[in-house]
């Protein structure tokens, strides 16, 4: 049992040493998203007025 622990220790030691010695990767620069398209910035269309005209004219008849 003692030999097994010793073998595991010997096998794990290089992994631990190499992990501590390696440099962490450089952070990725934050990329600014592009500006939204122009059609998104326009006001929403007014659907209420045309629908009121359709509904009122059908109620009269």
UniProtKB/Swiss-Prot annotation:
Predominant location: host cell
Record lipid sites (N-palmitoyl cysteine): 20
Keyword Membrane: yes
Highest taxon of source: Viruses
Parts of the chain that traverse the membrane: none
Keywords per UniProt: Cytolysis, Disulfide bond, Host cell lysis by virus, Host cell outer membrane, Host membrane, Lipoprotein, Membrane, Palmitate, Signal, Viral release from host cell
Its job: Component of the spanin complex that disrupts the host outer membrane and causes cell lysis during virus exit. The spanin complex conducts the final step in host lysis by disrupting the outer membrane after holin and endolysin action have permeabilized the inner membrane and degraded the host peptidoglycans.
Protein name per the record: Spanin, outer membrane subunit
Organism name: Escherichia phage 933W (Bacteriophage 933W)
């Amino acid at each position: 049992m003692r030999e097994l622990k010793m073998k595991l220790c010997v096998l794990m030691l290089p992994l631990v040493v190499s992990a501590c010695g390696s440099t962490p990767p450089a952070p990725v620069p934050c990329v600014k998203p592009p500006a939204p398209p122009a059609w998104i910035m326009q006001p929403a269309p007014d659907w209420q007025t045309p629908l009121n005209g359709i509904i009122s004219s059908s109620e009269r008849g």
